[in-house]
């Protein structure tokens, strides 16, 4: 691991965050071979907000007007990327209120809600409803983990007002949920 001077590290840190505003302090610390505290001090010195604030900023600037099928504040998780009728990505941080108290495992309806609301959000119509969902929970998710849900819209096979959206949710690189959502939507006039 190459050691950088403070000035070089801060310049590279700024570039890394500009390229990926969703990178964590822990990932940055590993990338630059320094402590998380050093990264936090560098961020403060550069006036770069913490991850949660960066995510909120990106989502509010880019996606508040893009989502038509439901208000942005009704989306479970935070949308970090969306291309209507194509794909979308959201993140959801599992906190104490989302888990069973006795074993700290996330309640399944939170994972489902994130995936379902993402499947709804990617539909470009004002009315989008789930008509059928097939969901498989691959592994349990624990308190403190971050779920990244990725939705992909399948190409339409006919003129029906049904669109199929596949959603896969991950913790890191590990698949935790896989779902197929059939979405009814009012056709655009």
From Swiss-Prot:
Gene Ontology biological process terms in this record: fatty acid biosynthetic process; negative regulation of DNA-templated transcription; negative regulation of fatty acid biosynthetic process
InterPro entries according to UniProt: HotDog_dom_sf (IPR029069), Transcription_factor_FapR (IPR017275), WH-like_DNA-bd_sf (IPR036388)
Organism domain of life: Bacteria
UniProt keyword list: DNA-binding, Fatty acid biosynthesis, Fatty acid metabolism, Lipid biosynthesis, Lipid metabolism, Repressor, Transcription, Transcription regulation
Keyword Transcription: yes
GO molecular function: DNA binding; DNA-binding transcription factor activity
Keyword Transcription listed: yes
Protein family (similarity comment): Belongs to the FapR family.
Summary of the function given for this chain in its UniProt record: Transcriptional factor involved in regulation of membrane lipid biosynthesis by repressing genes involved in fatty acid and phospholipid metabolism.
HAMAP family: Transcrip_fact_FapR (MF_01814)
Protein's UniProt name: Transcription factor FapR
Organism ancestry: Bacteria, Bacillati, Bacillota, Bacilli, Bacillales
Gene name of the encoded protein: fapR
């Amino acid at each position: 691991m190459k050691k950088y001077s403070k000035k070089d590290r801060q310049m590279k840190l700024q570039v890394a965050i500009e390229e990926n505003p969703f990178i964590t302090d822990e990932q940055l610390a590993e990338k630059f071979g320094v402590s998380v505290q050093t990264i936090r001090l560098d961020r403060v010195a550069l006036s770069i907000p913490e991850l949660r604030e960066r995510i909120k900023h990106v989502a509010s600037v880019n996606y508040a007007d893009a989502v038509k099928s439901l208000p942005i504040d009704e989306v479970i998780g935070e949308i970090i990327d969306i291309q209507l009728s194509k794909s979308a990505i959201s993140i959801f941080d599992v906190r104490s209120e989302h888990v069973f108290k006795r074993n700290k495992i996330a309640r399944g309806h939170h994972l489902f809600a994130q995936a379902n609301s993402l499947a709804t959000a990617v539909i470009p119509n004002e009315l989008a409803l789930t008509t059928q969902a097939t969901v498989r929970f691959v592994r349990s998710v624990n308190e403190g983990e971050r779920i990244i849900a990725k939705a992909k819209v399948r190409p339409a096979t006919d003129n029906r007002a049904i669109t199929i959206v596949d959603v896969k949710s991950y913790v890191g690189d590990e698949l935790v949920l896989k779902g197929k959502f059939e979405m009814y939507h009012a056709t655009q006039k």
